[in-house]
Amino acid sequence: MIYRYPRYGQLYEASKQLRRTFSAQDFRDLQVLSQLAWFDEEFLKGDRDVRDLIRKGRNYTLEEQRLMGRKQREIMAKVLPVYKEFASRGQIEISATPYYHPILPLLCDSDIASVSHHGVPLPQRFRYPEDARHQLVKAREYMETTFGIAPVGLWPSEGSVSDEAMRIAADVGYQWFATDNGVLGRTLGSTAGAFETYRPYKWKSEGREMHCIFRDHYLSDLIGFEYSRMGAADAAQHFLDRIRENCGGRDAVVPIILDGENAWEYYEEGGREFLRQLYKRISDASDLQALSVSEALAQNGAHEIGHIFPGSWIGANFDVWIGAEEDNQAWNLLLRAREAYEAGKDNVSPAAKAMAFEEILIAQGSDWCWWYGPEHDSANRVEFDQLFRGHLANVYKSLELQPPEELSRTLLHLTVTDLHDKPTGRIKPTIDGMVSSYFEWLGSGNYRLEERSGAMHSQRNIIQSLSYGTDGQHLFLRLDFHELPVAASLELHLKTESVELEITSSRFCLERILEAAFPLRELGVQPGDPVRFQLSVWKEKLPVAAVPQQGWLEMDTNEPGDWPA
């Protein structure tokens, strides 16, 4: 996608060494080309304005950048009407996914994770099946409004199923669901091969029933991950040969299910030629027929099952979204916000109540915990973490409550040692809010925040660094800012056995920096004892930064010679 455009490739290579030397023109070219790269072949070749932008190749003007944006909106506006047209004439069947893409079984009962993974560490129990119902109803209503057809089929987020979740889906009108054949294998108690996978099932539970199909994991992954490295015709033929081989001449229903947006960027021309080759071969074949799920179910009998094993398409379990420390912390924060909503929803206006609940539904989306935990990584994990905690903070704000301080701290396990220098000697700074002398903070500890980590509502933390130290009588603190806070408050949190402290002799001053001094005796710190502390910055009743971002800073108050090396 990048090297197809010479200037884009040049900028990409330059970014590896010279990113900070980019000119305004470099950035404009990058903005235009990085968006053009995602245009479909139909528009790259068929739209004159887009062709002209590609032909120019570099030195784009502001007006050309705006033209590219208009073309994006123009093309995107055509997408939903095309789907609606195809669905209305029966050429495609549109299924639904829960509205904000939650893992339904975990909303119904987070403890279900221990069924598919015995001994998995669990958060506090989250049990709100009514939220799962709301996500399913909201999705179906939106699809009906958008396409004029209420979907009867359900692909649960990440293929995640359980008996309780599917009973709710049946109650709200869904007639079939799909998941992975790994779940089928654990349901049947044996490996699900082609014979078991290539037939419809009818699931029944407590008076509800739905048809279900199980995707061929291997064949679906060939399209998703392998065929992009083959010629289009060879890949299409290989795919159909495998289907024929697996079916062995018998009638079969072969479910092929994959993320519809992720694979094609790796194919030549966005996968268009592969799909043409595949569909042509299916259309020309006498032994193959392309069917929607509902058509396949209507034409084939179903094998009955009385239970579905709880799991997802990844490992037939829920380990991606629960069990790791970061995941479980996220679930605990979600639970506390949900409980706060129940307690406070009747104390605010209907509009505020609706806004608070919408923020909860958003925070239930599976993508947050996709990026928490050890399984996946992204250059934007910090931003995802900020957004998740921001949505939870908005729950409290909508309920006219103070968001808890814990929402100011990242859930990510950042490496603090690379950012933290411990004190090396005693200090006695002048509390004037100015850098009076280089030497006044020499010997202090210093904690530096990564520019993009920690701030809940901005792209970088307002705090640049925290310096701290002692003269044996006081705790001295210094905050350096990327930008001076306006209408903000600062809270000092101590990890101490004291229940309540009254500090009467503190001194502080904010000019270019913030400097403060707190008597150790008024902090409840005995001579020679360590002091453990954390700072947080609040604006508009929301925590926007914390130092450190997790845990506590600890400072020894002994004589410097007694300090550990």
Which residues fall in each region the model found?
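Active-site and substrate-binding clefts of carbohydrate-active enzymes
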Residues: 1-53, 192-425
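Hydrophobic faces of well-ordered beta-strands that scaffold small-molecule active sites
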Residues: 94-97, 152, 176-179, 254
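Surface-exposed, glycine/proline- and aromatic-rich loop segments on solvent-exposed faces
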Residues: 431, 435-505, 533-545
